[in-house]
A protein has these predicted regions:
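N-linked glycosylation sequons
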Residues: 1-343
Length: 343
């Protein structure tokens, strides 16, 4: 089953089973974080305009269920960008990727970041294939073009409508027929050959040519389109499909990092790292009854580490407060050994 949260921020909940012989382990608490907004870095290639992407992510066209804070830079600024500050990164027609930039992007994805790639006219295939190799993915072999002006190089053939990307996008068809996507006209298409690793083709064209490919690497994910985000390669950006597909792609990618709060067992301890918190800041832990506990804390590079241990922590949900603001929610679970009635 699935549940859609109706608010943002740090949320707490529980899953409960029917009563049985031992009642105290029939519920399992959890916490999750639904961000107020998702920070997106849009990196435009030299001479590439991100107008269609900006328009597609504008508040006037996108749903209110998620808010995107878009920061736009040219590809020359990629090496100086701190990727970890963003929930997803878009490479829009980027031409070249240095070895340092490839290493930074790979580390970002492996650490849980989301990457969206649109090809471009002048992209250096060796640079992008180097990045794809680092991510354990396949290879770009070239660009296909139609044999005549205005002739499409292919049409949508197979669509994985069961993918999370399309959740709730199509109405149920009682006849069992597969929903059909609007068919854009493709003038040019990037040719991509998948590897045998953790990747899947979400949308393919006739001839089994990937149009939208997902690549999993480490804790993160990459979505790669077969066309650029303008109207030179296709008319996709002026089709009704473009905005929901772009929106859902970034929503999906920006959620690839873990959104669950930390947890520990009763009687154990935990070192909780809070990034970006000044060393002199007082951290407070508050339980469900409103009682507060001030843990020992120490300053490390770029963060504060709080030592959570002691008799204060019994099964339940706890708020972590910095200057009276909830910055984290954690769960203390009962020891599983307590559920073993044979002991």
């Amino acid at each position: 089953f699935s549940v859609l949260p109706n608010s943002r921020g740090w949320l707490a909940g529980r899953v409960t089973l029917d009563d049985n012989q031992y009642l105290y382990d029939n519920s399992r608490r959890f916490t999750l974080h639904v961000p107020e907004q998702r920070n997106i870095l849009l990196v435009n290639g030299s001479g590439v305009d991100g107008a269609y992407l900006r328009l597609g992510l504008s508040t006037e066209l996108s749903s209110s269920s998620a808010r995107f804070n878009l920061e736009e830079v040219s590809e020359t600024a990629l090496s100086a960008s701190v990727l970890g500050q963003f929930d997803a990164v878009v490479l829009n027609g980027v031409t070249t990727l240095s070895s340092g930039e490839r290493a930074a992007v790979t580390a970002y994805v492996n650490g849980g970041g989301g990457l969206l790639i649109f090809p471009g006219d002048d992209m250096q295939l060796d640079d992008f294939n180097g990045l794809l190799s680092d991510l354990g993915a396949g290879r770009i072999t070239g660009i296909s073009a139609g044999s005549a002006s205005g002739q499409s190089v292919g049409v949508f053939d197979r669509v994985d409508t069961d993918h999370t990307l399309f959740e709730g996008m199509f109405e149920s068809d009682l006849s069992g027929r597969t929903p059909q996507l609007e068919q854009p006209v493709f003038f040019r298409m990037m040719n991509y050959v998948p590897a045998q690793g953790a990747e899947q083709t979400i949308i393919s064209l006739t001839g089994d040519v990937p149009f939208l490919q997902e690549i999993r690497s480490g804790q993160g994910s990459v979505l790669m389109f077969g066309v650029e985000a303008g109207v030179r390669w296709s008319d996709l950006p002026v089709r009704g499909l473009f905005v929901p597909l772009l929106y859902r792609s970034l929503y999906y990618l920006s959620a690839t990092a873990s959104v669950s709060g930390e947890s520990m067992l009763t009687g154990s301890g935990m070192q909780l790292r809070l990034a970006g918190v000044p060393g002199a800041t007082r951290i407070t832990i508050r339980d469900e009854a409103g009682q507060e506990f001030v843990p020992e804390q120490r300053t490390v590079l770029g963060a504060v580490v709080a030592e959570l241990t002691g008799s204060f922590f019994i099964p339940g949900t706890y708020d972590v407060l910095v200057n009276n603001d909830v910055v984290r929610r954690i769960v203390v679970h009962p020891d599983p050994a307590e559920s073993n009635l044979a002991l």
